[in-house]
């Protein structure tokens, strides 16, 4: 998402900041590359301690099924800790938009990492607390066979009390479902090697490991090759760069890559950190957890449950864990969202979901 200026703000928000019953003052907004999704942030005029976030989705750019799935997962999780709470959804067919409305007062982890003047992340106990909450959120998702598919710093929100909420379920799916969207720098080797595969919970686990490194180093996109020409950026280049961080040669053959990903031997590759990176992390238990999250063979990557029991996180998770957290009641029959959806059915299902928000 990139920030946009006041002049670039599209209607219907440019001239009228009142949407339905929400009265707010627009402060900022950002958009994705093709303008299909725009996120607005503003101050709630009726309660200035709260911000209002409006995610505008253009229906012409995103399939009915994808829009409804995002709303479905947001409603499914709205009463759970560690997840963004959806306040309302609005449909404007004449403007061709859906509005998802959230109320809170948060900043993204991405913003905290990018803030050069902010010493917030210099507190290593606070970093551990953030990592614990993200991990517990993934534990809840995976216990319910939900894969987020786009865990990254912009999708992790933190409030003034350092409470974490995971947001943006536009790529979420149930296990064994395909999901087309991904962010290359947080995608695991097996997916970069073959994007046709169906991602599972181990994809989220890889992203968690990347985020851990970035929190300790206060650096975004740890797996981004800063020396690479933009024209050369593709999944193969990205995969080779990731493998180089494990000390594995570049220009490796596809056959050798497949052997690494499906390696069943006891041989394990770990990230080779620079001396200054080790000094910044300065926690052997954290390094051990990172090495167990960032395993090239997905079958050998630990689960969120096991990560919570690790030496690094166990002080927060002791007494909190259950091997089963399947406690979520589904707002509608999910099978309604698995087939192609007509415009008429879209409106019917949308209204069904909207009725469930205030339950």
Predicted features by range, described:
Residues 204:
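Conserved catalytic-loop aspartate of Hanks-type protein kinases
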Residues 130-131:
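Activation segment signature within eukaryotic-like protein kinase domains
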Residues 246-289:
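C-terminal lobe substrate-recognition/regulatory segment of protein kinase catalytic domains
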Residues 319-359:
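C-terminal intrinsically disordered, low-complexity extensions immediately downstream
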Residues 85-98:
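Short beta-strand micro-motifs within the conserved protein kinase catalytic domain, predominantly
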Residues 95-108:
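Conserved short submotifs of the Hanks-type protein kinase catalytic core
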Residues 142-158:
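Catalytic-loop of the protein kinase fold
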């Amino acid at each position: 998402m990139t920030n946009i200026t006041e002049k670039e703000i599209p209607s219907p928000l440019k001239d009228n900041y009142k949407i339905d019953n929400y009265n707010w003052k627009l402060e900022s907004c950002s958009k994705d590359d093709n303008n299909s999704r725009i996120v607005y942030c503003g101050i709630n005029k009726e309660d200035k301690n709260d911000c209002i976030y409006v995610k505008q989705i253009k229906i012409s750019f995103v399939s009915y099924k994808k829009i409804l799935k995002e709303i479905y997962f947001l409603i499914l999780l709205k009463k759970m800790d560690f997840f963004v709470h959806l306040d309302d959804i609005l449909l404007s067919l004449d403007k061709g938009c859906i509005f998802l409305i959230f109320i809170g007062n948060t900043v993204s982890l991405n913003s905290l990492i990018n803030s050069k003047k902010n010493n917030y992340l210099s507190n290593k106990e606070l970093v551990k607390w953030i990592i614990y909450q993200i991990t517990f959120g993934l534990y809840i998702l995976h216990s319910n066979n939900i894969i987020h598919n786009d865990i990254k710093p912009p999708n992790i929100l933190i409030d003034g009390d350092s409470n974490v909420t995971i947001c943006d379920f536009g790529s979420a799916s149930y296990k064994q479902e395909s999901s087309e969207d991904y962010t290359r720098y947080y995608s695991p080797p097996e997916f970069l090697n073959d994007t046709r595969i169906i991602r599972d919970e181990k994809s989220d686990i890889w992203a968690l490991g990347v985020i851990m490194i970035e929190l300790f180093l206060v650096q975004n996109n740890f797996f981004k090759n800063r020396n690479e020409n933009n024209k050369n950026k593709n999944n193969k280049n990205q995969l080779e760069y990731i493998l180089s961080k494990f000390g594995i040669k570049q220009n490796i053959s596809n056959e050798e890559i497949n052997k690494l990903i499906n390696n069943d031997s006891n041989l394990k590759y770990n990230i080779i950190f620079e001396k200054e990176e080790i000094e910044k992390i300065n926690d052997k238990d954290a390094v051990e957890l990172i090495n167990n999250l960032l395993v090239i063979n997905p079958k050998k990557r630990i689960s969120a449950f096991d990560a919570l029991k690790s030496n690094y996180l166990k002080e927060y998770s002791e007494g909190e864990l259950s091997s089963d957290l399947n406690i979520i009641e589904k707002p509608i029959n999910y099978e309604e969202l698995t087939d192609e959806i007509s415009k008429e059915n879209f409106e019917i299902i949308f209204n069904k979901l909207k009725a469930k928000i205030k339950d």
